[in-house]
Amino acid sequence: MGISRDSWHKRYKTGATQPVPHKKRKFELGRPAANTKIGAHRVRLVRTRGGNEKYRALRLDSGNFSWASEQTTRKTRIVDTMYNATNNELVRTKTLVKGAIISVDAAPFRQWYEAHYALPLARKKNAKLSEEDNAILNKKRSHHTMKKYTERQKTAAVDALLIEQFNTGRLLARISSSPGQVGQANGYILEGKELDFYLRKIRAKKAK
């Protein structure tokens, strides 16, 4: 028996079985879930109705995540799955699905912020900087260039909860694409009330 997306195999509310109007049709077919896991990039092509194509991601290790308040997007490494509203089993098995809350590497976003604003982000006072970071933050700039950075720095404030996350080197993000259909795990960084909500959910789950 194949996976079918029809409704006539279900019983009536009274408990009676529905009559079978016809055999299964090609347009009613369903496919097994992709169950995308964290690992070295592995994507398969699936031919669909009308000769169209879907990209079935079996393993993914990175994705494009947008930082909405800063209007920037960076490709970053996926570290772990943290929370899933539908099923804890998907968290335990580290399955990447649309709507999953995951942790991603904060480094690309920190590098962008420090290059864009010429300000350190979530760094300890008097902490030793690498040569690369030192070249960005303490670079000699012309008066004209500094004027541009000074103007940018007026809007450089970052949410306190987000700074805490930058300190750990991990950011919470939500997957907004369907990895089993588009072959990518793209999403956005959690901020503000949404971040606060999911932090409370994760803490409550750990406390059990």
UniProtKB/Swiss-Prot annotation:
PROSITE patterns per UniProt: RIBOSOMAL_S8E
Cellular component, GO annotation: cytosolic small ribosomal subunit; membrane; nucleolus; small-subunit processome
Pfam family of the protein (one): Ribosomal_S8e
Regions annotated as coiled coil: none
Membrane topology field: Lipid-anchor
This protein's UniProt keywords: Cytoplasm, Lipoprotein, Membrane, Nucleus, Ribonucleoprotein, Ribosomal protein
Keyword Membrane applies: yes
Biological processes per GO annotation: maturation of SSU-rRNA from tricistronic rRNA transcript (SSU-rRNA, 5.8S rRNA, LSU-rRNA); ribosomal small subunit biogenesis; translation
Molecular function GO labels: structural constituent of ribosome
Paired cysteines (S-S): none
Entry keyword Nucleus: yes
Compartment annotation: Cytoplasm; Membrane; Nucleus, Nucleolus
Matching NCBIfam families: eS8
Family: Belongs to the eukaryotic ribosomal protein eS8 family.
Function: Component of the small ribosomal subunit. The ribosome is a large ribonucleoprotein complex responsible for the synthesis of proteins in the cell. Part of the small subunit (SSU) processome, first precursor of the small eukaryotic ribosomal subunit. During the assembly of the SSU processome in the nucleolus, many ribosome biogenesis factors, an RNA chaperone and ribosomal proteins associate with the nascent pre-rRNA and work in concert to generate RNA folding, modifications, rearrangements and cleavage as well as targeted degradation of pre-ribosomal RNA by the RNA exosome.
Subunit structure: Component of the small ribosomal subunit. Identified in a IGF2BP1-dependent mRNP granule complex containing untranslated mRNAs. Part of the small subunit (SSU) processome, composed of more than 70 proteins and the RNA chaperone small nucleolar RNA (snoRNA) U3.
Protein name, per record: Small ribosomal subunit protein eS8
Higher taxonomy: Eukaryota, Metazoa, Ecdysozoa, Nematoda, Chromadorea
